Swiss-Prot record:
This is Aspartate--tRNA(Asp/Asn) ligase. InterPro entries: Aa-tRNA-synt_II, aa-tRNA-synth_II, aa-tRNA-synth_II/BPL/LPL, Asp-tRNA-ligase_1, Asp-tRNA-ligase_1_N, Asp/Asn-tRNA-synth_IIb, AspRS_core, GAD-like_sf. ATP binds at R220, D221, E222, Q229, E484, G536, I537, D538, R539. GO terms for cellular component: cytoplasm.
Length: 588
């Protein structure tokens, strides 16, 4: 028996018992006749005392170093009052060792295990098996386990069936890039790794499995950002005979109970707020706004419709917008700070940032633009924005898409600077009534906002042929603290409607049959009305764990360049393997 107890288990009630522990040497303190070793496993830390009176055990303790794997036998005893450590669960006891054995020595680790030392992330990822020994990483992975377990238990109680869908599927290159897998048995043909089980879960609805879920691994070959990975995990769900409200109500119950159970220290705001897509874009410049703070966008276009200020006037003349954000009490910002905010706005596409400080003493306005306005225009602008003395007003004039992107970035930056977003608050919301399609100016075509299987609203079906841009989708996104937590929709379940949407997206009958023929045929055999959603597990756990990226809540993530530094994947393969797959590498 390697251990009778874990390193986080022993308490004063165990005093006098002989125990066997095994773990890693966390810290070692040599006081000559007494050597103290903090022995660690994933359950906690126990202090072990080696007395020179037990010469053999003491001799072993003299040789061990950090991260040695050690087995110890000894007797539990109560620590002296002055030696109690309130920072660990076992802090009232220690183990007096009478026997010890090194199970495996260890080289000096390239990273500190006992504490965060600010190493470059590349070092942490290269030695991930060491990084995962740290308390922070263990805490994150245990939280992830608890989240997934809660979801499984909740959905099982709701009558859902967990069904695994294939990892090797057909490539349908309509969204992000697929990861392709060559077939040895079928030369020149390829499987794709699933970007999501979307089509398969809809086919399960046709098959009669009316409540399906899966903790699904998904793959997308796309450019990486802080919250993206080439492979990720989502809670994939689908239900038959449901409408939008049925899905929303179930998910709201799931996440409310999940957060209250798994992260009870967090303040969960309920009921979940609800915004239309148009409202979210108008008020926040984003379809995933962080609603823990205000800083709403204010439309000033009508107030400035007749302005003589050429910068605003020229933008409005070509259908642009002028919008602003009021930053309460921040009129004291320095010019350097305002210049930094200007760069943030420019990162969203804005050509610049107009600013003004509302005077506190009835004096002149300090501003980059107010002197160019007509008499009374600044007062009207300030009134529209609800400005108070000492407020800072920030304004962008440009095309609506640029105004939205710039002010969204500005809003998030201000919240960060002013510490407006409480990390212990969870603010979920639903964004609904998305457009079904959006115009792709570069390709001169309509693209699906979500995916081509999203159902149009019944009352907008007649617009598909005449005014597609006005068609609203039966789509709903769950957002959390400024992130998209999950996207869902009611799906198309009739072949004629699906073909009409394919046609709108430029997918002709021949192409539709080649790529989606299995779906179209299935719809002819009694497909029920159905819908679902797919919340991201990685992102949810990232937010619950207060981590900056999903890499901190995944066991073995890739870098932002999609490289596994630990195993050096991707890597070359030998010529024999390529030949078996009928593949030849062609140099650029």
């Amino acid at each position: 028996m390697y251990r009778s107890h874990t390193c986080g288990e022993l308490r004063p009630a165990h005093a006098g018992q002989e125990v066997t522990l095994a773990g890693w040497v966390h810290r070692r303190r040599d006081h000559g006749d007494l050597i103290f070793i903090d022995l660690r496993d994933r359950y906690g830390i126990t202090q072990v005392v080696f007395n020179s009176a037990n010469a053999a055990a003491h001799a072993v303790a003299e040789t061990v170093r950090s991260e040695y794997v050690l087995q110890v036998r000894g007797k539990v005893r109560i620590r002296p009052a002055e030696a109690v450590n309130p920072d660990i669960a076992t802090g009232e006891i220690e183990v007096d060792a009478f026997e010890a054995q090194v199970l495996n020595p260890a080289r000096t680790p390239p990273i500190y295990i006992a504490k965060e030392a600010g190493e470059d992330e590349s070092v942490r990822l290269k030695y991930r098996y060491l990084d995962l020994r740290r308390e922070r990483m263990q805490r994150n992975l245990i939280l992830r386990h608890r989240v997934v377990k809660f979801i499984r238990d909740f959905l099982d109680a709701e009558g859902f069936i967990e069904i695994e869908t294939p990892i090797l599927i057909k490539s349908t290159p309509e969204g992000a890039r697929d990861y392709l897998v060559p077939s040895r048995l079928h030369p020149g043909k390829f499987y794709a790794l699933p970007q999501s089980p979307q089509q398969l879960k809809q086919l399960l609805m046709v098959a009669g499995y009316d409540k399906y879920f899966q903790i699904a691994r998904c793959f997308r070959d796309e450019d990486q950002r802080a919250d993206r990975q080439p492979e990720f995990t989502q809670l994939d769900m689908e239900m038959s005979f449901v409408d939008q409200e049925d899905v929303i109500n179930l998910i709201e119950r799931l996440f409310t109970e999940l957060c209250r159970t798994v992260t009870p220290h967090k303040r969960l705001l309920t009921p979940f707020r609800r915004l239309t897509y148009a409202e979210a874009m108008e008020r926040y410049g984003s379809d995933k706004p962080d609603l823990r703070y205000d800083l709403e966008l204010v439309n000033l276009s009508d107030v400035l419709a007749e302005t003589p200020f050429q910068v605003f006037r020229s933008v409005l003349a070509v259908g642009g917008q002028v919008k602003g954000i009021r930053v309460p009490g921040c009129g004291h910002f320095s010019r350097k700070q305002i210049d930094e905010l200007t760069e943030v706005a420019r990162s969203g596409g804005a050509k610049g940032l107009a600013w003004a400080v509302v005077p506190t003493d009835g004096g002149d306005v300090r501003s980059s633009f107010a002197k160019n306005l007509a008499p009374g225009e600044f007062d009207a602008l300030a009134q529209r924005m609800g400005a108070q003395p000492g407020d800072l007003l920030l304004i962008v004039a440009d095309r609506p898409v640029v105004v939205a992107a710039s002010l969204d970035k500005l809003r998030r930056k201000l919240a960060d600077l002013l510490q407006l977003a409480d990390p212990d608050t969870l603010c979920f919301a639903w964004v609904v009534d998305f457009p079904l399609v959006e115009w792709n100016e570069e390709e001169q075509r309509w693209d699906a906002v979500h995916h081509p299987f999203t159902s149009p609203k019944d009352e907008d079906l007649h617009l598909l042929a005449t005014d597609p841009g006005k068609v609203r989708a039966k789509a709903y996104d769950l957002i959390l603290n400024g992130y998209e937590a999950g996207g869902g929709s009611i799906r198309i379940h009739r072949r004629d409607v699906q073909q009409q949407v394919f046609s709108l997206l430029g997918i002709g009958e021949e192409k539709a049959q080649a790529q989606f023929g299995h779906m179209l045929e299935a719809f002819e055999y009694g497909a029920p009305p159905h819908g679902g959603i797919a919340p991201g597990i990685d992102r949810l756990v990232m937010i619950l764990a207060d981590e900056p990226t999903i890499r901190e809540v995944m066991a073995f993530p890739k870098t932002q360049q999609a490289v596994d530094l630990m195993t050096n994947a991707p890597s070359p393969v030998d010529e024999r393997q390529l030949k078996e797959l009928h593949i030849r590498i062609v140099e650029d």
